[in-house]
Design a protein with these regions (language model features):
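Short, well-structured N-terminal submotif of metal-dependent ribonuclease cores
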Residues: 1-34, 46-58, 126
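Active-site neighborhoods of divalent-metal-dependent phosphate/nucleic-acid chemistry enzymes
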Residues: 67-108
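Acidic, PIN/NYN-like endoribonuclease modules and their adjacent C-terminal/linker elements
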Residues: 1, 64-65, 95, 99-126
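General small-molecule cofactor/ligand-binding pocket signal
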Residues: 33, 68-69, 121
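Alpha-helix C-capping/helix-to-loop hinge sites
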Residues: 29, 45, 49, 62-65, ...
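Amphipathic alpha-helical segments within well-ordered protein domains
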Residues: 10, 40-43, 79
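Alpha-helix capping/helix-boundary segments
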Residues: 8-9, 38, 74, 93-94, ...
Length: 126
């Protein structure tokens, strides 16, 4: 199972330098888990940068994976991770979703570098 965080989705949709690193887990829709917080973050950023039509296309592609909403158990797991690891709320919800589902978290967010169960792809310098 795989979770791609918002930075990975945005890199993929922008066809950025690391897009190919995220293409595999994104293409494997049967094993793709999509936390609802990533829908929010990607829609908002795409709306700002490309407009509503493009943002809706991005979210439609994301919804081909299995969406996971936040319930009480996930919220509490995320809060504990946030406290223990000093992560922002969205990051802790994404990491908690991956861990609850036994999934690998794919990201280029350096907040996750070196964490267990995380495939961290550094952003190119420059």
């Amino acid at each position: 199972m795989n979770v791609v965080d918002s930075s990975g989705w945005l890199e993929y949709f922008a066809d950025g330098p690391n897009a190919d690193d995220f293409a595999g887990p994104i293409a494997d829709r049967a094993n793709l888990i999509v936390p609802v917080i990533t829908l929010y973050e990607v829609f908002k950023r795409s709306l700002q940068q490309q407009g509503e039509e493009a943002a809706r296309v991005c979210v439609a592609a994301m919804q081909e994976g299995r969406g996971v909403e936040v319930d009480a158990d996930l919220a509490l797991s995320a809060a504990k991770l946030s406290f223990d690891l000093k992560l922002p709320m969205a990051d802790s919800l994404i990491l908690a979703t991956a861990r609850v589902h036994g999934a690998t978290l794919w990201t280029q967010d350096d907040d996750f570098a070196g964490m267990s169960g995380v495939r961290y792809i550094p952003k190119p310098k420059g």
